Amino acid sequence: MPFEFSPLKLVYGGEALGYAEGRTVLVPRALPGERLEVESVRVAKGVVHAKPLRVLEAAPERVSPPCRYFGRCGGCHYQHLDIEHQVAWKSEIVRETLKRIGKIAWEREIAVHQASPWNYRNQAQLKVVQNESGEVALGFFEGESHRLVPIDECLILSPRLNQVLGQLRQPQWLGRLRGCREVELLANEQDNQVRITLFGNFETGEPEPLAGDLLSQVEGVVAVAFCDGQRTRVFGETAFTYRVGEYQYQVSAGAFFQSSRYLLPEFVTAATETAPGDIALDLYAGVGLFTLPLAQRFRQVIGVESHPAAARDLEANVRSHGLKHVRAVGQPASDFLRRFAHKEPDLVILDPPRSGVGKSTLQYLIDLRPRSVHYVACHPPTWARDLACLLSRDYRLEGVEMFDCFPHTYHIECLARLVRQD
């Protein structure tokens, strides 16, 4: 049954939170201060998840979403909110998360870095769905579902990725994607070269003919990779590269790389900026986004990465830049820290996955007693949890920064700078 709802605030996850009849209510595409008519969709752990039916009284910061798929496609969450208020709310969410989860009352400024709000993504994960009649569709899933929304363009993808997407949606290509479950597109920093990675088991035979046709007929495509869960085969340019500042990074199919192109140089500078020293560790290093720039400031740098493809790229990137004082280590951060003998490194950079660092790895890190820790995170809740652990063990929080790398979504990149208190 529909009921009236007035949200109080936005929360991490892209929804608006409020209360009705003593129960917590979460509603997407709603704004604080509005009056809406909503309807319950489900109740989980005592929280009512509802959908908006009508806006009865709109907030002044509400805008008309420019994307015709907004509200169905699960990619964006805030296109109904003007960009200034998006950034303000994200900053408040970072502060509130520190307080609620980390019990950290950060009263000082949160430095905010903003990206251009459109065409900023250099990467897309497109879903492929085949219906009962055998027709293949390409697009994004609806929020919290596996229902496909076929799309012609995405306003947050780079122009080149939109061009490739438009071509792949043509019938001659869709029919050749049977057996594929996901198509990943990655554009380089100039947005003039694209790698297509196809995930799945293909029903159309060997991949060479499809790869050859994609390379020759889709403008901008320079590499095509096929991943079937057992192995990865690459056609075209086997070493796809992405330049950030003065460094060129090899990024293999399956290796993680930042997907927001506009803030990358600023992001790298902020994470690596520190006084010169002897030893720096870059844990969860990926392909070496922070590892290589650290080489300018430290006599010895060690990048640690456990993902096989990313670890190989890390080693290749260190080697290609001739950095003799930089070492690439392919193992989990916890294993490396447990065996690392050099106490008190000058700097440790943490950039873990959404799950965070975790207790045991944090304990190994604390035992190592680094002088400074820069903690980069894409998931504020686990970031705040881990920061609380560090702050309870002789570390002081010196600064907090927020990077709005993904406008119109709830996603946030955070940076915390900590120093050891002797």
Enumerate the language-model features and the residues they cover.
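Terminal RNA-binding accessory module
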Residues: M1-Y69, S145
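Hydrophobic beta-strand signal
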Residues: E37-E39, Q125, L281
